Amino acid sequence: MGIVRFGVSIPKELLEKFDGIIEEMGYTNRSEAIRDLIRDMVVRHEWQLGDEEVAGTITIVYNHDEADVVRELLDLQHEYLNEIVSSLHVHMDEHNCLEVIVVKGRAKKIKKIADRLLSLKGVKHGKLVMTTTGRDIV
């Protein structure tokens, strides 16, 4: 992998804000921060295309006392065995549980799984976090 140097023209104030942020985040130079921004854009583009193989997590908080939420949650996980890689279950208190579901597959299908999980009655909050499989990222 070769490195290419290029120039960017931006307002001074924007650069100063950027420098402050990357210093706060622990970057040692602008180049690595810019590379990470570009990588993030590539990953988001993969998800938008829908046909790319992607990875991610679906995190939900739900009330396990709610009628059928546990059964429906398990049924959905079994329905998508090829896409659901793993799950972590945490008891938050006597009523609420946190579930982190690791997924890998085509972006459109992963979004569909997340939508179905997040819309279950009894789910209080949820979020799909999208990332890459790492295969095509440099």
Curated annotation (Swiss-Prot):
InterPro entries: Acetolactate_synth/TF_NikR_C, ACT-like_dom_sf, Arc_rbn_hlx_hlx, CopG, CopG/NikR_regulator, Ni_resp_reg_NikR, Ribbon_hlx_hlx, TF_NikR_Ni-bd_C
Required cofactor names: Ni(2+)
Alphabetized CDD domains for the sequence: RHH_NikR_HicB-like (cd22231)
List of residues binding Ni(2+): 78, 89, 91, 97
Listed GO MF terms: DNA binding; DNA-binding transcription factor activity; nickel cation binding
Keyword Transcription regulation: yes
Any GO BP annotation: response to nickel cation
Co-factor: note: Binds 1 nickel ion per subunit.
Pfam families cross-referenced by the UniProt entry: NikR_C (PF08753), RHH_1 (PF01402)
Keywords of this entry: DNA-binding, Metal-binding, Nickel, Transcription, Transcription regulation
Signal peptide residues on this chain, from the entry's feature table: none
Membership in a protein family: Belongs to the transcriptional regulatory CopG/NikR family.
Function: Transcriptional regulator.
Protein name: Putative nickel-responsive regulator
